Amino acid sequence: MTLRPLHDKVILKREEVETRSAGGIVLTGSAATKSTRGKVIAVSTGRLLENGSVQALAVKAGDVVIFNEGYGVKSEKIDGEEVLILSENDILAIVE
């Protein structure tokens, strides 16, 4: 299945990071915190401005980003994999 985001939405896959405790134990499940880093897999055509024009988004497919996981972030399972759908405003930085 292919998703095509609308408005100013971005679809990304969370990048899992291995988390270790201070003693070197690998934390999993509820003991580990979820990563707020992800790889963009699809972006919309842009944000609709008040004057009717469309402003392209700053991120593109393939970018690795750091995002704010808050109220507006939607988690969905597509073809057995979790994807996140969020507004470009929820993206804090592009990792270069």
Curated annotation (Swiss-Prot):
Keywords: Chaperone, Cytoplasm. It comes from Actinobacillus pleuropneumoniae serotype 3 (strain JL03). InterPro entries: Chaperonin_GroES (IPR020818), Chaperonin_GroES_sf (IPR037124), Chaprnonin_Cpn10_CS (IPR018369), GroES-like_sf (IPR011032). GO terms for cellular component: cytoplasm. This is Co-chaperonin GroES. HAMAP family: CH10. CDD domains: cpn10 (cd00320). GO terms for biological process: chaperone cofactor-dependent protein refolding. PROSITE patterns: CHAPERONINS_CPN10. Belongs to the GroES chaperonin family. Together with the chaperonin GroEL, plays an essential role in assisting protein folding. The GroEL-GroES system forms a nano-cage that allows encapsulation of the non-native substrate proteins and provides a physical environment optimized to promote and accelerate protein folding. GroES binds to the apical surface of the GroEL ring, thereby capping the opening of the GroEL channel. Heptamer of 7 subunits arranged in a ring. Interacts with the chaperonin GroEL. One of its GO terms (molecular function) is unfolded protein binding. It comes from the Bacteria. It is found in: Cytoplasm.
